């Protein structure tokens, strides 16, 4: 992934960290898939599987940051390499937060199951946004592995679709609660799930912004999408 250096050991260090970040991404992806399954099937077992995996994600984040700190201390990286290491650290933090959101979805599923709300809840409506968010994370990890700026820019664009799905679901959920007040508690759990899904999209967007920072040296956070597209073309 990174460009070659005079020190083969430095290249090895960078490649090891990159591999560990990608492995963490794979673990978090599996958490999301299991959380979506728990929601679609109202499966307490699947929800519990997501929750017990959370500590693996947390320990992976700590270990990657330890590796990054060690490389910075031993190698005295150049400005570009330091950008890469910083972006790896921030990407790791965002992946850990995606894991947190997956665990939050699982906990809300368990809360719904422990309540008395009817199974006619509009949970299936979340599948579209959940699939979009899961696909966006996969794309962000692919872009990270390749340092693919055009793909990163497309992720910024696609995150808007998840935001639109979230807004539409909230409107539908409000109507649902008004029609049947018995579902208010479970509907609020669904609202938290919808927000968690939306946040997964946001974290994927953050990773895309870090990719642009690594390759171009430009911090595009808080920059309008049209301006980013123009500067990257």
Give short role names for the model-derived ranges:
Residues 1-233:
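Cytosolic, long alpha-helical scaffolding segments
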């Amino acid at each position: 992934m990174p460009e070659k250096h005079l020190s083969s050991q430095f290249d090895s260090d960078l490649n090891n960290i990159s591999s560990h970040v990608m492995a963490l991404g794979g673990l978090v992806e599996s958490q999301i898939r299991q959380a979506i399954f728990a929601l679609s099937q109202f499966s307490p077992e699947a929800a519990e599987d997501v929750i017990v995996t959370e500590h693996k994600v947390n320990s992976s984040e700590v270990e990657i940051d330890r590796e990054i700190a060690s490389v910075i201390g031993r190698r005295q990286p150049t400005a570009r390499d330091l950008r890469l290491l910083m972006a790896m650290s921030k990407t790791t933090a965002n992946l850990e937060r995606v894991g947190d959101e997956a665990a939050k979805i699982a906990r809300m599923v368990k809360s719904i199951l422990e309540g008395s709300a009817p199974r006619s809840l509009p949970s299936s409506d979340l599948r579209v946004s959940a699939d979009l968010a899961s696909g966006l994370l996969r794309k962000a990890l692919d872009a990270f592995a390749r340092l693919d700026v055009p793909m990163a820019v497309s992720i910024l664009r696609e995150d808007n679709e998840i935001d639109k799905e979230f807004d539409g679901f909230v409107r539908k959920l409000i109507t649902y609660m008004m029609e049947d007040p018995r579902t208010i508690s479970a509907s609020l759990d669904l609202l938290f799930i919808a927000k968690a899904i939306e946040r997964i999209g946001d974290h994927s967007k953050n990773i895309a912004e870090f990719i642009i920072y690594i390759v171009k040296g430009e911090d595009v956070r808080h920059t309008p999408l049209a301006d980013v597209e123009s500067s990257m073309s």
